[in-house]
Swiss-Prot record:
Top EC category: hydrolase
UniProt catalytic activity: a 1-O-(1Z-alkenyl)-sn-glycero-3-phosphocholine + H2O = a 2,3-saturated aldehyde + sn-glycerol 3-phosphocholine; a 1-O-(1Z-alkenyl)-sn-glycero-3-phosphoethanolamine + H2O = a 2,3-saturated aldehyde + sn-glycero-3-phosphoethanolamine
Keywords for this protein: Cell inner membrane, Cell membrane, Hydrolase, Lipid metabolism, Membrane, Transmembrane, Transmembrane helix
Protein name: Lysoplasmalogenase
Biological source species: Legionella pneumophila subsp. pneumophila (strain Philadelphia 1 / ATCC 33152 / DSM 7513)
Location in the cell: Cell inner membrane
Length: 216
């Protein structure tokens, strides 16, 4: 069976992601605002060109659009940057969760993955609590939704490895970003955060396209 997520789109995504990662150490706003979302735009174009059903296509595009909005918001220098960024990515995760639940098939064996993920996220959240201030509630809500997204990714009935790997990369990216943003503030960490983020978005998009082109 041929899947309609095209190789040219994948290569353009890879090229633009590498360009951004390589340039990240020496570019600043507004260049970051322009370059950062381009790989996600490539994924949106790729999804538009697929043969997915209208409902699956709309949900996946919405997940990517809100991710793109979050990418842009987090590069803009204004006071509500973090709050709006969290809101955008929270909505993106909700659309991903909806897609996962539409193809839900409970697998008891995958429950063994939940405990280490839960402990890891719990430890990260506990570590950050003293540093969050007014963002405590939004960040904790976001963490809960992120964890639900990861857990539900493990229960899709097909393409489970690709989709769950994408969800785990998203978790790693978000936790690294949060720890660095609120505690460590090391500039070099941005490259790792964006690398894992781009890998996550590609795996989630590619996996979901394959899943729903197989009939969900």
């Amino acid at each position: 069976m041929t899947y309609s997520f095209s190789k040219p789109v994948s290569w353009v995504f890879l090229f633009t992601a590498v360009i951004y990662l390589v340039s990240l150490s020496f570019i600043q706003y507004p260049a970051t605002t322009v370059l950062k979302p381009i790989p996600i735009v490539c994924l949106i174009v790729g999804v538009f060109r697929t043969s997915l059903s209208s409902s699956a296509k709309i949900l996946l595009i919405l997940a990517l659009v809100f991710s793109l909005a979050g990418d842009v918001v987090l590069t803009l220098p204004f006071s509500l940057q973090l709050e709006l960024g969290i809101a955008c990515f929270l909505l993106a995760h909700c659309f991903y969760i909806t897609l996962f639940l539409k193809s839900f098939e409970f697998n008891r064996l995958h429950l063994f993955y939940y405990l280490p993920i839960f402990l890891f996220m719990g430890f990260a959240a506990f570590t950050m609590i003293p540093y969050l201030g007014n963002l405590l509630i939004p960040v904790m809500i976001y963490f809960c939704v992120l964890m639900l997204m990861v857990f539900s990714a493990f229960q899709v009935k097909k393409e489970t490895l690709t989709i769950s790997s994408g969800a785990l990369f998203f978790l790693i990216s978000d936790l690294t970003l949060a720890l660095n943003l609120f505690i460590y503030t090391q500039a070099d960490v941005r490259i790792f955060v964006m690398f894992t983020y781009y890998v996550a978005q590609f795996l989630l998009t590619f996996g979901l396209v394959r899943l729903y082109e197989k009939g969900g």
